[in-house]
Amino acid sequence: MADFLPSRSVLSVCFPGCVLTNGEAEQQRKSKEIDKCLSREKTYVKRLVKILLLGAGESGKSTFLKQMRIIHGQDFDQRAREEFRPTIYSNVIKGMRVLVDAREKLHIPWGDNKNQVHGDKLMAFDTRAPMAAQGMVETRVFLQYLPAIRALWDDSGIQNAYDRRREFQLGESVKYFLDNLDKLGVPDYIPSQQDILLARRPTKGIHEYDFEIKNVPFKMVDVGGQRSERKRWFECFDSVTSILFLVSSSEFDQVLMEDRLTNRLTESLNIFETIVNNRVFSNVSIILFLNKTDLLEEKVQVVSIKDYFLEFEGDPHCLRDVQKFLVECFRGKRRDQQQRPLYHHFTTAINTENIRLVFRDVKDTILHDNLKQLMLQ
């Protein structure tokens, strides 16, 4: 029967458009495969939930991103933990240098004058050395400074300077690490999950983290919050589903590190006003995270917000009154009060369980709003 089948050459004469050479067939197969990939990519992009983390420097964005990694299945393995060790050592040395400098400028006497030698040693630390300039300190170097750091932290003069920390710039995790010097001083010290969450590494550039929840792809983008980094924000605005705007709610009595003049809460309010009234985000859900609730709760007991925001009318030592005032401040920055609702949450970014519960609610809000937008397209 094969003798009666027309040859390939006959077919090509009779039906020139129906016969493909091996090369043409392969090209067509590749073309179809590319079309399938593009179709899948288009579907993925349409389903992708892109969340932008915005806020002033040290508001907790990077800590929140670390929590997403912990909560959604990519915990820090031993190698990743070890990579944070030089950063933590740098945090400790930098923090102690700030305290030694503050003690002198605030004219606080030493508890023990012999500690002047230790203070001088810390102030002579070479911050321009290659690793130190990148915010890292080797174990060998840290252990050389450890006895001096321990003696200084035990000095009443340094403790008094710490008690007046709102008068100068000091990292919020410094006390945690100084209280754990014995653990940090072990030569084979491996940072714990909590150590990593509290380690401070200023965000330079753009950091992304991808994860899935029930087959829905999420992309979380963290951009540096310092003034010098904010010009990069516009690079991330494309195809944004939601913005999580983080505020350090406890910093109502502190000023910016960049200019030493601007109130930190005022700076956050100004940034938020720019974001919430930007037409680019008219269809984007904006969720306000009033972060560092644990520190705010401590602060309202001893510092009156009314001394810094005269319009405050509640009880300055009542956490709920202060939180209500903060929410009203941010809501008041929206020029169009009829626009999409402004969701808010009170958070403590270093508390994994708190962030797990809050993000569960946030995820539902984002997915609900995103579904409505897709239905309108």
From Swiss-Prot:
Transmembrane segments: none annotated. Palmitoylation is critical for proper membrane localization and signaling. GO terms for molecular function: D5 dopamine receptor binding; G protein activity; G-protein beta/gamma-subunit complex binding; GTP binding; GTPase activity; metal ion binding. GO terms for biological process: adenylate cyclase-activating G protein-coupled receptor signaling pathway; adenylate cyclase-modulating G protein-coupled receptor signaling pathway; angiogenesis; branching involved in blood vessel morphogenesis; cell differentiation; G protein-coupled receptor signaling pathway; in utero embryonic development; intracellular signal transduction. SMART domains: G_alpha. Its main location: membrane. Residues 287-294 are annotated as: G4 motif. Guanine nucleotide-binding proteins (G proteins) are involved as modulators or transducers in various transmembrane signaling systems. Activates effector molecule RhoA by binding and activating RhoGEFs (ARHGEF1/p115RhoGEF, ARHGEF11/PDZ-RhoGEF and ARHGEF12/LARG). GNA13-dependent Rho signaling subsequently regulates transcription factor AP-1 (activating protein-1). Promotes tumor cell invasion and metastasis by activating RhoA/ROCK signaling pathway. Inhibits CDH1-mediated cell adhesion in process independent from Rho activation. This is Guanine nucleotide-binding protein subunit alpha-13. It comes from Rattus norvegicus.
